[in-house]
Amino acid sequence: MSNTMFFNLLLNIGLLVLIATMLTKLPMVRSMLLEDSHAMGSRAALAVIFGLVSIFSTYTGVRAQGAIVNTRVIGVLAAGLLGGPYVGIGAAVIGGLHRYLFDIGGFTAVSCAVSTFVEGLIGSAFSKRFKAGKIDGAGVFLITALAEIGQMAIILLISRPFPAALDLVCLIAFPMIIMNALGMVVFLGTFNRVFMEEDSQFAEKMRLAMGIVDQSLPHLRKGLYSKTDMEATA
């Protein structure tokens, strides 16, 4: 069963990375990720997008002892890290509510819905540090692992009967913690390329601007007294 879970999680992570790659190619998504205005419309759109990613992860999960082994944490945690509190909480509400409605009365329906919301809060809490470049891949791995450990704790606190919850956590904890933490690093790396490309374009524009300044300075020092100097500066 453990090997099946590892394989399923790996497959789901691959699908999420594919989705992330396609999303980063859409001009609308790129502009929303890069914009500084933080318009509510953009925040809502990003929350829906990452909420749908979370829902997708629920559907592609594999059932195990009344629970669903999944990669849902990747969507909601990434929403918080990339988009901030509004996006993270919005995506978590969408993903968590769907998880509850997906299996109403199920053994882990409430606990998994609650943990999804908590994971969105965790991502939101680290958003400023992540955007400032203060959280590297190892930090992302650790945050995701801690979020998943939190999910296991919530399952133990809420799901009943307790012996069944304990058996479930013993079965799914290691695969979900390790694979989702690794998957989050790869998933965010896909989106980080958007910021890297933007920085590269900015650096190229600055290089061109400095080149123009270097070419113009000799003529500016002499003064624009001749037609030749004015044409050279232009």
Segments from the language model and where they lie:
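Membrane-interface helix-loop junction between the first two transmembrane segments
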Residues: 22-37
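Hydrophobic, membrane-inserted alpha-helices
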Residues: 50-54, 72-77, 91-99
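Alpha-helical transmembrane segments and their helix-entry boundary regions
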Residues: 65, 76, 80, 88-92, ...
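Membrane-embedded alpha-helical hairpins and interfacial helices in multi-pass inner-membrane proteins
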Residues: 1-25, 47, 58-73, 103-216
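Short regulatory/linker helices and ligand/cofactor-binding micro-motifs at input modules
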Residues: 211-228
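Short, intrinsically disordered, charge-balanced linker/junction segments flanking boundaries
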Residues: 228-234
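Loop-to-helix transition at the N-terminal end of transmembrane alpha-helices
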Residues: 36-51
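Interfacial segments of multi-pass membrane proteins
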Residues: 83-84, 97-102
